[in-house]
Curated annotation (Swiss-Prot):
PANTHER family: GROWTH ARREST AND DNA DAMAGE-INDUCIBLE PROTEIN GADD45, GROWTH ARREST AND DNA DAMAGE-INDUCIBLE PROTEIN GADD45 BETA
Database matches in Pfam families: Ribosomal_L7Ae
Protein name per its UniProtKB record: Growth arrest and DNA damage-inducible protein GADD45 beta
Record field: transmembrane: none
UniProt GO cellular component terms: cytoplasm; nucleus
Species this chain originates from: Homo sapiens
Example GO biological process: positive regulation of p38MAPK cascade
Upper classification of the organism: Eukaryota, Metazoa, Chordata, Craniata, Vertebrata
Entry keyword set: Apoptosis, Developmental protein, Differentiation
Origin superkingdom: Eukaryota
Described function: Involved in the regulation of growth and apoptosis. Mediates activation of stress-responsive MTK1/MEKK4 MAPKKK.
Gene3D superfamilies the UniProt entry points to: 3.30.1330.30
Similarity remark: Belongs to the GADD45 family.
The keyword Acetylation belongs to this UniProt entry's keyword annotation: no
Subunit and partners: Interacts with GADD45GIP1.
Gene: GADD45B
Length: 160
């Protein structure tokens, strides 16, 4: 490996860490400010009613769920809708970390039904211009990825 290749790999890894941290920060802030829609069905309803308020769509799935055909069909339809409406999309793995970030109860309790975390929408109502460093960082990453012909960039949330 040449020095240039090593530097490029290091920069890519650092960029991925920055974007992952930005997504985590954005999700926590969006939930705190009631700007987060959780669930495939709820997200589809919101995008049908007010697609202009959606600024980011996160599609979350872990490797063991990749064979879920129904979920993949939902993702395909949501991705298509997002592309038609210029909504940034990011694929995310690490459902356990996602649940942890959103304060979901642990699976071991079993008494409460867990929310569907496979699709998350971050909204920005028309009435105010909410600016979040995390949102700017993620939007920049999405734009950069599209420039590299990666239409739906991927990040992995790591457990802590």
């Amino acid at each position: 490996m040449t020095l240039e290749e090593l530097v490029a790999c290091d920069n890519a890894a650092q960029k991925m860490q920055t974007v992952t941290a930005a997504v985590e920060e954005l999700l926590v802030a969006a939930q705190r400010q009631d700007r987060l829609t959780v669930g495939v069905y709820e997200s589809a309803k919101l995008m049908n009613v007010d697609p202009d308020s959606v600024v980011l769509c996160l599609l979350a799935i872990d490797e063991e769920e990749e064979d879920d055909i129904a979920l993949q069909i939902h993702f395909t339809l949501i991705q298509s809708f997002c592309c038609d409406n210029d909504i940034n999309i990011v694929r995310v793995s690490g459902m356990q970390r996602l649940a942890q970030l959103l304060g979901e109860p642990a699976e071991t309790q079993g008494t409460t039904e867990a929310r569907d975390l496979h699709c998350l929408l971050v909204t920005n109502p028309h009435t105010d211009a909410w600016k979040s460093h995390g949102l700017v960082e993620v939007a920049s990453y999405c734009e950069e990825s599209r420039g590299n012909n990666q239409w739906v960039p991927y990040i992995s949330l790591q457990e802590r």
